[in-house]
Structure formats: C-alpha cells, structure tokens
C-alpha cells in the first residue's frame, strides 16, 4: 500500500495537533496550582508586613518604612538577603536529614491549601475528607522539624525538635476532636459542605455560635500548632538559642521562616472555613450586581466577592495571634503539656460528646 505525500502531511499535522492539545492540557492543569502558590506567597508577605506594623503599633514605635511605600517590601528584602547568604551544613551532623527537614515542613503545609475553598466551589481539590486530609498532612510537619533537630548534631537543635514533636502530638488531638464536632454538625468532612451548611441563617448560622467551646479550644490548639507565643517553646531564644533552627542559615533558614507564616495563614483560613462561614457574606448582596450593571450569571462577580470575604475574615482573625505575641508570657514545658492533656483534651472530648448527643436527639 502506497501513501502519497498529502496523506503523510495530514498525519503529521494531526500528530502535531495532538501534541499541542497535550501541552495545553498540562498548562491548564498547572495553572490553578501556580496561581494558588502565587496567591499564598503574596498572602505570606502581607502577613509579615501586618505583623510588623501591628507589633510596632502595640509597642508605640515606628515599623519598617524605607523598603517601599509604608515598608511593604521589607519582607521581600529580607527574603532576598537570605537567598544571598551562605548555606552552611554542620560537618558532624547528618547531611541528608539536615537538608530534607525544612523541605518536609514546607511541603506538608503547602499541601494543606489544596482543600481550602476560597470561594463558591473555588477549591483546588474538593475532597470528601478535606478536613481530615488537612489534619493528616499537617501532622507530617513536626517530623521534618525533628529530623532537622536530629540532623544538626546540636543539643539545642535536638531539644527544639523534641519539643516541637511533643507539642504537636499534645495539641493535634484536641484540634482533631474540634474538627470532628464541626463535621458532625455539617454531616460532612468536605470543607465546601461545611461552609454551605453555615449559609442557611446568615451571620447566626456560623459554627462560632453553635460551637463556642470548640472554637476556643481550636484557637488555642492552632496557636500551639503554629508555635506562636505563648507556645513558642521549640525555638525559645533564652533557652535554646533558636531551637531546631540553630544551625541553619541561608535558604534553609528562610524555608523555616516561611513555614511558620504559612502555617499561621492556613490555620486562620481553616478558622474562617470551619467557624466563620467561609465565603458567605452575612448581609444580602443580591442587588449589588444589578446596581453596577454586572451580570451575575457569569459568577465572576460572586467569585471575586467570595474570595474577598474569605481573605477579609482571615486577616481580621490574624490580629488575635499577632496581638497575643506581645501580650502573654511564654509557658513552661510542663505547663504547656498539662494544658494540652489535662484541660484541652477533656474539654474537646466533652464537646464532641455533647455535639453527638444533640445530633442524635435531633434525628
């Protein structure tokens, strides 16, 4: 069978078209991920700037003001400085554990953002077990911290890693029990379903009013998970120099710095999703699109409003951990463990039993 030149050109053009479709498919698949990473990076820079400005206001001093207007580029300048610093590795430590520890901490926190809905079904992965996926993934981060402390071959680093692991285990259980109580109220483990379950009664439908005890326990546990004051024992400067970060410099130290703020942002986002109604606005906004001549059928305006509401609630809530840093003194290690095991765990367990009983009685 003889194939002429025209048929060969047709086959080649068809194969090129299929290759282009594959390339476009890969780009379209990576676009949401890259957009989320870019948004998270900008969000972390905003948190750093807010913390410095709020801290300066609390201490009645002037915050950063030279790096860009109002000092908004100060965090970017600090990151550039860390990138240009020398990356030192301890000669007597475990090089592999020392190098892989920061990466595990950052990647595990980054994966948590994949189940957070920023708008109406605007989520990277709408999993049916979204909240438990977050708990499972976030529990990997302390493993990276422990590896960093052990791989540094430094007593201060090792003690900091052990403290981080003990603290995470102590407060992960009350956190999970509070999340389970919310899931029982919403009859779902999906983050999207939990937000939609709070949209029935507007402001009064938030889980904050139905789970006030769980909200307080969740707030304390999330502060401990983020290692924020008064729970920053793994890196207490007066006791452990810098904890598991003592031997780190350059980009690896910058990864730990980013991981702490990534964890703070993801905790605040989950507070918004689980307790503050997510993307739902508490006041009617049905007539706003018609007022400005915007067609709501395209859902563009509604999506932008949802993203704005979610981020506004998140950054308003961030004022609490930032203000707490300059308000409360650091706990001792025995006080921290007693608070987690003797108080928060029984309270969260009792809250779960009450929630289960109320749900059974309502059947």
Swiss-Prot record:
UniProt cross-references to PROSITE patterns, sorted A to Z: COMPLEX1_ND1_1, COMPLEX1_ND1_2
Cellular localization per UniProt: Plastid, Chloroplast thylakoid membrane
| Enzyme class, UniProt record, top EC level | translocase
**What membrane topology does the annotation report for this chain?**
Multi-pass membrane protein
- Determine if Ribosomal protein is one of this entry's keywords: no
Q: What does this protein do?
A: NDH shuttles electrons from NAD(P)H:plastoquinone, via FMN and iron-sulfur (Fe-S) centers, to quinones in the photosynthetic chain and possibly in a chloroplast respiratory chain. The immediate electron acceptor for the enzyme in this species is believed to be plastoquinone. Couples the redox reaction to proton translocation, and thus conserves the redox energy in a proton gradient.
Q: State the protein's name.
A: NAD(P)H-quinone oxidoreductase subunit 1, chloroplastic
Q: Which organism is it from?
A: Nicotiana sylvestris (Wood tobacco)
| Gene behind the chain | ndhA
């Amino acid at each position: 069978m003889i194939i002429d030149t025209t048929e060969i050109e047709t086959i080649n053009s068809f194969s090129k078209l299929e290759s282009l479709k594959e390339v476009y498919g890969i780009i379209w698949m990576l676009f949401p991920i890259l957009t989320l990473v870019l948004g998270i990076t900008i969000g972390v820079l905003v948190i750093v700037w807010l913390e410095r400005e709020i801290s300066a206001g609390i201490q009645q001093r002037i915050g950063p003001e030279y790096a860009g207007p109002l000092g908004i580029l100060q965090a970017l300048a600090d990151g550039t400085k860390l990138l240009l610093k020398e990356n030192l590795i301890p000669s007597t430590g475990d090089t592999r554990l020392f190098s892989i520890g920061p990466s595990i901490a950052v990647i595990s926190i980054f994966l948590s953002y994949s189940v957070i809905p920023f708008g109406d079904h605007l989520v990277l992965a709408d999993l049916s077990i979204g909240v438990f996926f977050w708990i499972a993934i976030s529990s990997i981060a302390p493993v990276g911290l422990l590896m960093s402390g052990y791989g540094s071959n430094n007593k201060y680093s090792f003690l900091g890693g052990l403290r981080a692991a003990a603290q995470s285990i102590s407060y992960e259980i009350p956190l999970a029990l509070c999340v389970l109580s919310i899931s029982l109220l919403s009859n779902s483990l999906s983050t999207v379903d939990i937000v939609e379950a709070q949209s029935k009664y507007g402001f009064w439908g938030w889980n904050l009013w139905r789970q006030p005890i769980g909200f307080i326990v969740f707030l304390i546990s999330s502060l401990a998970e983020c290692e924020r004051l008064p729970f920053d024992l793994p890196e207490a400067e007066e006791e452990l120099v810098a904890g598991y970060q003592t031997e780190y410099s350059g980009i690896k130290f910058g990864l730990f710095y980013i991981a702490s703020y990534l964890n703070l942002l993801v905790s605040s986002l989950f507070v918004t999703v689980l307790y503050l109604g997510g993307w739902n606005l508490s006041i009617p906004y049905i007539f706003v699109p018609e007022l400005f001549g915007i067609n709501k059928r395209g859902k563009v305006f509604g999506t932008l409003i949802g993203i704005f509401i979610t981020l506004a609630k998140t950054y308003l809530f961030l004022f609490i951990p930032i203000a707490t840093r300059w308000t409360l003194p650091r706990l001792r290690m025995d006080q921290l463990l007693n608070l987690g095991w003797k108080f928060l765990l029984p309270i969260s367990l009792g809250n779960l039993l009450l929630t289960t009983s109320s749900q059974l009685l309502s059947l």
